[in-house]
């Protein structure tokens, strides 16, 4: 059997937006009511995505980490889930600054991410419209999902699967670019040698 592809995913957002609940819903298909928001956890999960076995390492960040810790998590990850709570406008407004930090940390690479509006079951308390989420996702050039870790509404599994697909696509593009670049260097070296020989 072929070795499984390994993907490192990290989930970011303000404390209380439901990051842990989203991860637990994805892994267990259940909702757990109580979490310690100061805990950071890493989970391993294997899944078959598009006929390929993928081993995910998922970092559930605490949401209250200091700058050095957060930047270390950003350097570690290959794909990112940025989460806000649709009932908390402040959490939505923190997404763009978070993306800017990600861009700075991952420079010059483009960041692979997905935007998630959580707590869609609390529509009666909504402070961020679906359209605003879609608009921000367009600005960030990423996919957007609204879901509820509590009820399972929306497709949380698809969030993680789509992020894995994006990471794999990005790797393939970077691999081709690297191969093209090294082929060009070899051709240039051969041309230099041939020029010296003929002169």
Curated annotation (Swiss-Prot):
One of its GO terms (molecular function) is GTP binding. It is found in: Cytoplasm. Signal peptide: none annotated. InterPro entries: P-loop_NTPase, Ras-related_GTPase, Small_GTP-bd, Small_GTPase. GO terms for cellular component: cytosol; fibrillar center; nucleoplasm. Its main location: cytoplasm. This is Ras-related and estrogen-regulated growth inhibitor. It comes from Mus musculus. The lineage of its organism: Eukaryota, Metazoa, Chordata, Craniata, Vertebrata. The gene is Rerg.
């Amino acid at each position: 059997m072929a070795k499984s592809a390994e993907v490192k995913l990290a989930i970011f957002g303000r404390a209380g937006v439901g990051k842990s609940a989203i991860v637990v819903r994805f892994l267990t298909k259940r909702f757990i009511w109580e979490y310690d928001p100061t805990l950071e956890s890493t989970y391993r999960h294997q899944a078959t995505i598009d006929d390929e076995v993928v081993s995910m390492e998922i970092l559930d960040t605490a949401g209250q980490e200091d700058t050095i810790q957060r930047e270390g998590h950003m350097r570690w990850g290959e794909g990112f889930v940025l989460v806000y709570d649709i009932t908390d406008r402040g959490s939505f407004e923190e997404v763009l600054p978070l993306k800017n930090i990600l861009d700075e940390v991952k420079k010059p690479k483009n960041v692979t991410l997905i935007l998630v509006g959580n707590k869609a079951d609390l529509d009666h308390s909504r402070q961020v419209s679906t359209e605003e989420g879609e608009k921000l996702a367009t600005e960030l050039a990423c996919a957007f999902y609204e879901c509820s870790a509590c009820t399972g509404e929306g497709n949380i599994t698809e969030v993680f699967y789509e992020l894995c697909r994006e990471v794999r696509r990005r790797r393939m593009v970077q691999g081709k670019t690297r191969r093209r670049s090294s082929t060009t260097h070899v051709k240039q070296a051969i041309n230099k040698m041939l020029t010296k020989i003929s002169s």
